[in-house]
């Protein structure tokens, strides 16, 4: 009997959050280990479906780095990276687009639908959702000077046209976005999926942006999870070395989204089953929340 009471208490803990977020929009960046593990894939799909059933408009943006690497290797194409960004020539872009839109997107849509949801896949080219310009990287040379490097078809999102997402939401669908954008001349661009999620969240005036990662969240220098970070504290955390390496672009993505009107951003460990529900519907959460 006690176990049943505890289950009821868990449901009641979620009730105020369900009331608060019903009718609102949440954008989720889906990637990392959560995409590779069968149990985590099902957990993710069920979380997203539940959000939709209780009236939360859910938009998914997926990555696909490992799948791209595997396919490029199979084709004998060697990737070069500049400041963590893949140099993407025309041949590489063709493979990237094929993998993201033709393989990964269909897989994500498939396992949401197979578990009882109604997902619809698209890329940033559909409905001119993500308009891009070429992203140029600034690189320091050995003499200390700064050089601008052209890394090919890597895009910087300059415009988001969310009408197609809003139409899908009204139709009861869960939009699943592949991070491929389009230039003014119709050319395809590879875009960082975290950036896409942040830009889409801002365009939809989302209540939350959630980035699923392969770490527990932002940690202090002592290795303890920082469960909540005020937006104003982020620059100091980067300057003093608390936020380092690959976490910097993720945190920056969150702060950019908050500055553009998103209410809260979360960095959550996607290796935990039902991580999305635990972060949204419990009093403590499991990741790092960044709030304005």
Swiss-Prot record:
Listed GO biological process terms:
arginine biosynthetic process via ornithine; L-arginine biosynthetic process
The reply on keyword Transferase is: yes
| Enzyme Commission number(s) of this protein | 2.7.2.8
Q: Which domain of life is it from?
A: Bacteria
Has keyword Nucleotide-binding? yes
Assigned keywords, A-Z: Amino-acid biosynthesis, Arginine biosynthesis, ATP-binding, Cytoplasm, Kinase, Nucleotide-binding, Transferase
Family to which this protein belongs: Belongs to the acetylglutamate kinase family. ArgB subfamily.
Locate the site labelled Transition state stabilizer. 29, 250
Supply the name of the protein: Acetylglutamate kinase
UniProt lists the gene as argB
Print the organism lineage. Answer: Bacteria, Pseudomonadati, Thermodesulfobacteriota, Desulfuromonadia, Geobacterales
Gene Ontology cellular component annotations, sorted alphabetically: cytoplasm
Q: Where in the cell is it found?
A: Cytoplasm
Say which species the protein is native to.
Citrifermentans bemidjiense (strain ATCC BAA-1014 / DSM 16622 / JCM 12645 / Bem)
